[in-house]
C-alpha cells in the first residue's frame, strides 16, 4: 500500500516525561503522540525521531516523521492531534506537513542544537529554576570554560564524552560550543553538532564545569579527549537543565545525498 510521509515538529517540557521512546506503562512523549495517531489512523504507525531525548530533557523543536496509509490533510491532522493532546499541557504539536518520501527525520538532519543551563554561586538561586537549571555550589571561571570549549570544537573522536557502545562511531563534528553568562547570572552552554552520542552533551558540559571550578586542568581535559575513553573525571550532568533547541536540514533536493552520508557514518 502507498503511504504518505508527514513531518511533525514538537515541543515539550520534559520534567514529567520518562523520555521520548514509547514504553509500556510509562508516560513518554513518543508514546502520547503514538496513542493519538492510533486514534486517528486505522494502521499502527511507526515514529522516527531526529534526536532521542532522555527523561527530563526538554525540547523547543523536536522533529519526527511518520508514514500513514490514510493520507489525511496535514492541516486536519495538526488540529486533530492538538485536540487529542490538549490535556497534555507539557506537550505541543508545532506543525504537521507532508514530506517527500526521501525525507528522514534522523538521517536527513545536518545539525542538532542544544543549550544547557547552569547557575553558580555568583548568582541568587530561585526555586522555580529547579526544573530547568543545574545548580553548582562553586564559583565558575568563565574564561577557563571558554578556553576549554574552543579547544573541543572540530571533527574529533568524542569517545571520552560518550556512553560506551560496542557498535557505531563516536566521531562527531562539534561546530559550536559557546559559554555565555546571562544578565541574571545564569551560564548557558550552547552546542551544535552533526549529531551527538548518548549523554555526550551532558558530559561535555560536565567537563567544562570541572574546568571552571578548578578540579580539572585544560591539559588533562585535552589529554582525555585525545585518548577518547570514558573516565570518571568527566561527570555526567543531570538531564533536567538540557533543552533541544532545534534540528537543521538541508534543502529538499539534498535529502537523499544526506541520508546516504549519515547512514554510512552511523550504521
UniProtKB/Swiss-Prot annotation:
Entry EC no(s): 5.4.99.12
CDD domains: PseudoU_synth_EcTruA
A molecular-function term among this protein's GO annotations: tRNA pseudouridine(38-40) synthase activity
Annotated catalysed reactions: uridine(38/39/40) in tRNA = pseudouridine(38/39/40) in tRNA
Domain of life: Bacteria
Alphabetic keyword roster: Isomerase, tRNA processing
Keyword Secreted (UniProt): no
Positions of the catalytic residues: 54
Family matches, as Pfam families: PseudoU_synth_1
GO biological process per UniProt: tRNA pseudouridine synthesis
InterPro entries attached to this UniProt entry: PsdUridine_synth_cat_dom_sf, PsdUridine_synth_TruA, PsdUridine_synth_TruA_a/b_dom, PsdUridine_synth_TruA_C, TruA/RsuA/RluB/E/F_N
Binding site for substrate: 114
Subunit record text: Homodimer.
Family as reported in the entry's similarity comment: Belongs to the tRNA pseudouridine synthase TruA family.
UniProt function note: Formation of pseudouridine at positions 38, 39 and 40 in the anticodon stem and loop of transfer RNAs.
Protein's name according to its UniProt entry: tRNA pseudouridine synthase A
Naturally occurring in which organism (per UniProt): Tropheryma whipplei (strain TW08/27)
Amino acid at each position: 500500500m502507498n503511504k504518505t510521509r508527514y513531518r511533525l515538529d514538537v515541543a515539550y517540557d520534559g520534567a514529567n516525561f520518562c523520555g521520548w521512546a514509547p514504553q509500556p506503562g510509562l508516560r513518554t512523549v513518543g508514546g502520547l503522540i503514538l496513542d493519538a495517531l492510533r486514534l486517528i489512523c486505522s494502521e499502527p504507525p511507526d515514529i522516527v525521531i531526529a534526536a532521542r531525548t532522555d527523561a527530563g530533557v526538554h525540547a523547543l523543536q523536536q522533529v519526527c516523521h511518520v508514514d500513514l496509509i490514510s493520507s489525511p490533510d496535514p492541516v486536519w491532522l495538526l488540529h486533530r492531534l492538538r485536540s487529542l493532546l490538549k490535556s497534555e499541557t507539557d506537550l505541543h504539536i508545532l506543525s504537521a506537513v507532508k514530506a517527500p518520501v526521501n525525507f528522514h527525520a534522523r538521517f536527513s538532519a545536518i545539525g542538532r542544537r542544544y543549550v544547557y543551563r547552569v547557575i553558580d554561586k555568583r548568582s541568587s538561586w530561585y526555586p522555580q529554576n529547579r526544573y530547568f537549571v543545574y545548580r553548582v555550589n562553586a564559583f565558575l571561571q568563565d574564561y577557563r570554560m571558554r578556553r576549554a570549549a574552543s579547544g573541543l570544537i572540530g571533527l574529533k573522536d568524542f569517545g571520552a564524552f560518550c556512553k560506551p557502545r560496542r557498535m557505531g562511531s563516536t566521531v562527531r563534528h562539534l561546530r559550536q560550543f559557546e559559554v555565555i553568562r546571562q544578565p541574571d547570572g545564569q551560564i548557558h552552554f550552547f552546542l551544535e553538532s552533526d549529531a551527538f552520542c548518548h549523554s555526550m552533551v551532558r558530559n561535555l558540559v560536565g567537563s567544562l564545569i570541572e574546568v571552571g571550578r578548578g578540579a580539572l586542568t585544560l591539559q588533562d581535559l585535552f589529554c582525555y579527549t585525545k585518548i577518547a575513553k570514558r573516565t570518571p573525571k568527566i561527570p555526567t550532568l543531570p538531564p533536567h537543565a538540557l533543552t533541544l533547541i532545534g534540528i537543521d536540514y538541508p534543502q529538499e533536493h539534498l535529502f537523499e545525498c544526506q541520508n546516504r552520508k549519515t547512514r554510512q557514518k552511523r550504521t
